[in-house]
Amino acid sequence: MILKSFFKNLKKDFNNKSFNGFEFNSKKIKKNYIFFAIQGSKFNGNNFINDAIKRGARIIVSNKFKTGINKGVLYIKVSDPRLALSSFANKYYNKKPNNIIAVTGTNGKSSIVNFYYQILKLNKKRVASIGTLGVKSNGVSLKLNNTTVDTITINKILANLKKKKIENVILEASSHGLH
């Protein structure tokens, strides 16, 4: 994939720069990946830029420029790396089911999602649910660590469901996981 599809206003020299994948966790970085340096609740991604570069990141997206810029590494400064990652993941995994219903609230999310899932299934619709119980669908079962997963994971799951011709998804959206 090439950068110009995802970032506007790049210098011409960088428009055709390619990448193999992207992550916000430096431990998951592989050769020629993009690293999104995100401020989390416990960690600041900017503190892991060097680790990401050592692991193979060649493009860094951050809200700060790192001093002592490494040769061969492109830095892209954005005001909100988390929002940039969400937009990036949404474009990268651009094919998703047509009908996505999100359920949020203090109590009852799992029950409501399960009810919707059963109703659609009884009506012979190809349906999946995502939430506390993981990902559930015809022939698809996947455990998840959190009720609401990160933006890369949710986009990847939705794209995979679309590949399996599932057009209806009901998901739990915890208020903590929304952005």
What is each PLM-predicted segment?
Residues L83-H179:
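Phosphate-binding loop of NTP-binding sites
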Residues M1-S87:
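N-terminal leader/targeting and accessory segments in enzymes
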